[in-house]
Amino acid sequence: MSTYTPKAGDVTHSWHVIDATDVVLGRLAVQAANLLRGKHKPTYAPHIDGGDFVVIINAEKVAISGNKLQGKNVYHHSGFPGGLKSRTVGEVLDRTPDRLVEKAIVGMLPKTKLGRAMSSKLKVYAGPNHPHTAQQPVPFEIKQVAQ
């Protein structure tokens, strides 16, 4: 008997919603990346986009552990000479919390065409509302919350 290999048409994609309130950012990112890759399914294969859609709400209430709010910087470059910009994690969390959560999750996905396809199934919202109620997302509970 040969090993079962899933085909692209055999995979079904369900929807999950994760509430990021008081959840440590790294632990949230690991769980979301595993859902996006499909590693929670018994039919996981690294060459198939078998992951699910993930909707994250309340990104503005995510917990950052340690002294990272003031002590850790986030960098980006404009592409011009002298164009390196830096902000602390606290400043980024105040301005665009959805981008901070999205960058943490996308950084845990493969850096290939397949990884970009997986990251397109990630939807992050700063507040408690999202426009994906028609897809009937299933709540996904993360057991460990910040103290």
Curated annotation (Swiss-Prot):
Pfam families on file: Ribosomal_L13
InterPro entries: Ribosomal_uL13 (IPR005822), Ribosomal_uL13_bac-type (IPR005823), Ribosomal_uL13_CS (IPR023563), Ribosomal_uL13_sf (IPR036899)
GO cellular component: cytosolic large ribosomal subunit
Gene3D superfamilies from the UniProt entry: Ribosomal protein L13 (3.90.1180.10)
PROSITE patterns found in the cross-reference section: RIBOSOMAL_L13 (PS00783)
GO BP terms in the entry: negative regulation of translation; translation
SUPFAM superfamilies from the UniProt entry: Ribosomal protein L13
Family, similarity comment: Belongs to the universal ribosomal protein uL13 family.
Matches recorded under PANTHER family: LARGE RIBOSOMAL SUBUNIT PROTEIN UL13M, RIBOSOMAL PROTEIN L13
Self-association and partners: Part of the 50S ribosomal subunit.
Listed name of the protein: Large ribosomal subunit protein uL13
